[in-house]
C-alpha cells in the first residue's frame, strides 16, 4: 500500500491537488505495479517562512 506525502511551499488549488494525485497514482501503477485503489496521496502545505533553500527562507 503506497503512501505518498507531497510537501509543498505555498498553496495549491483543489484542481492542482487533484491533478497531482492522479499523476502520482498513475505513475505508481505503471512503474511499481501498485493498484490505484491502494495508493494514498496526502498534501502538506508548508508556509514560505517555514521553508528554506540554500540557507534562505522562501519568504525573504
What are these regions (language model features)?
Residues 2-60:
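A domain-level signal for the structural core that forms small-molecule/cofactor-binding pockets
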Amino acid at each position: 500500500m503506497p503512501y505518498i506525502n507531497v510537501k509543498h511551499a505555498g498553496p495549491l488549488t483543489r484542481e492542482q491537488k487533484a491533478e497531482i494525485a492522479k499523476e502520482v497514482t498513475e505513475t505508481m501503477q505503471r512503474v511499481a505495479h501498485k493498484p490505484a485503489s491502494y495508493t494514498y496521496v496526502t498534501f502538506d502545505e508548508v508556509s514560505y517562512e517555514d521553508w528554506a533553500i540554500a540557507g534562505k527562507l522562501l519568504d525573504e
